């Protein structure tokens, strides 16, 4: 028996077919044993639901559009070394957009949330980010993750049953007015970039900071055009509504807002994250570009999370919502990716059809990626 196929009851099975049939059995066993998502009743999901969820994941490429999985929290500078691939395989998650945080060296957390602890020195964040890209390269190679540089790469990884990552950067503070640095990180394998984060930069205003630019700067507009030219998914998470509205006027390709929730979300309930939620109008302008809004996983339960997805779908439509957990930043419902299939299963318990679940779980991001990256 080689690594690509095996015989069973006189039939030839591909590696991918064998993987999915094994996954159905293992997920059903986990459900029977009471294994579930944080704060959920996933153990109550039936083997039939698990099988239906896996069918969705087999027929569509699933994506977490924003994660820090494999790393060590937003303010830690330790190298990323967690076995991200193990959880992805167990939960049948195909793609993770693995976000590095270039402004990490100057961030701190307190009761008010995430703040900057000072002003970076010239070149400090640029040097730090390049070092982090080295670490991510080492981690992905060590754990057998594919690096996806194109939509064809994502499709090939899914067809083979191999987990893959999209290189992602959360905040372009390291550019320091130099567009050539954007081209350099593209050459290093990054395909998804977020304009702003928690540190003031020369691109635009961010939600939790003081407004200094009244939206997008002229350099920010240049950055968006360069993203389109080079082939990046352009992510406007953390940006103020005025910044996003200005970005929409510049953009000629779909924009992504990777991790948030609807402002005043009944499903999410009281939260210290109100400054990062978005209004209905904010969400709609993203959808108007053909883009999508990702919902983070900071909900009380899996059921409430899927309600949060439905809230956003009711505002922007089924083609404009995706999953962006922001995993490894704060506790949430997807503590590790072995539970991903439970999340898809919950989508199928009355809120969404299999086709709709496939769009949210990855199809909508894939549409954006194909257009933006190729």
Where on the chain are the PLM-derived regions?
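Conserved, mostly hydrophobic/aromatic
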Residues: 66, 150, 189, 234, ...
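A metal-dependent hydrolase metal-coordination microenvironment
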Residues: 87-180, 208-212, 218-219, 225-226
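Histidine/acidic residue-rich metal-binding segments in metalloenzymes
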Residues: 55, 82-84, 177-191, 209-256, ...
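Acidic/histidine-rich helix-loop elements
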Residues: 67-80, 103-124, 176, 197-216, ...
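N-terminal secretory signal peptides
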Residues: 1-17, 24, 40
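C-terminal segment of N-terminal export signals and the immediately downstream linker at the start
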Residues: 33-67
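Short acidic/histidine-rich active-site segments
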Residues: 296-297, 316-337
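C-terminal helical cap
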Residues: 292, 300-307, 358-369
């Amino acid at each position: 028996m080689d690594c690509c196929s095996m015989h069973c009851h006189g039939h030839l099975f591909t590696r991918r077919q064998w993987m999915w049939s094994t996954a159905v059995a293992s997920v059903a066993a986990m459900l029977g044993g009471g294994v579930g998502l944080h704060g959920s009743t996933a153990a109550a999901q039936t083997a039939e639901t698990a099988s239906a969820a896996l069918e969705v994941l087999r027929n569509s490429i699933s994506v977490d559009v924003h994660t820090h999985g494999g790393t060590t929290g937003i303010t830690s500078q330790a190298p990323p070394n967690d076995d991200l691939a193990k959880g992805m395989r167990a939960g049948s998650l195909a793609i993770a957009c693995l976000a590095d945080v270039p402004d990490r060296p100057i961030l701190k957390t307190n009761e008010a949330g995430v703040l900057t602890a000072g002003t970076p020195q010239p070149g400090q964040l640029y040097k730090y980010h390049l070092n982090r890209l080295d670490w991510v390269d080492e981690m992905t190679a060590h754990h057998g993750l594919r690096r996806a540089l194109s939509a064809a790469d994502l499709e090939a990884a899914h067809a083979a049953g191999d987990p893959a990552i999209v290189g992602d950067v959360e905040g372009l503070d390291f550019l320091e007015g130099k567009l050539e640095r954007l081209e350099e990180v593209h050459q290093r394998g990054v395909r998804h970039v977020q304009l702003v984060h928690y540190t003031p930069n020369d691109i635009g205003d961010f939600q939790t900071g003081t407004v200094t630019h009244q939206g997008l700067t002229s350099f920010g507009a240049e950055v968006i055009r360069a993203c389109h030219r080079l082939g990046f998914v352009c992510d406007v998470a953390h940006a103020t509504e005025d910044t996003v509205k200005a970005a929409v006027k510049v953009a000629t390709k779909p924009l992504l807002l990777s991790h948030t929730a609807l402002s005043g979300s009944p499903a999410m309930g009281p939260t210290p994250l109100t400054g990062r939620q978005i209004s209905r109008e904010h969400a709609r302008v993203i959808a108007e570009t053909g883009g999508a809004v990702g919902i983070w996983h900071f909900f009380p339960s899996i059921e409430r999370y899927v309600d949060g997805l439905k809230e956003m779908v009711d505002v922007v439509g089924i083609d404009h919502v995706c999953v962006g957990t922001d995993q490894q930043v704060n506790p949430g419902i997807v503590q590790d990716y072995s539970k991903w299939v439970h999340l898809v299963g919950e989508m199928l318990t009355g809120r969404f059809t299999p086709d709709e679940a496939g769009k949210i779980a990855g199809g909508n991001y894939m549409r954006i990626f194909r257009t933006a990256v190729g």
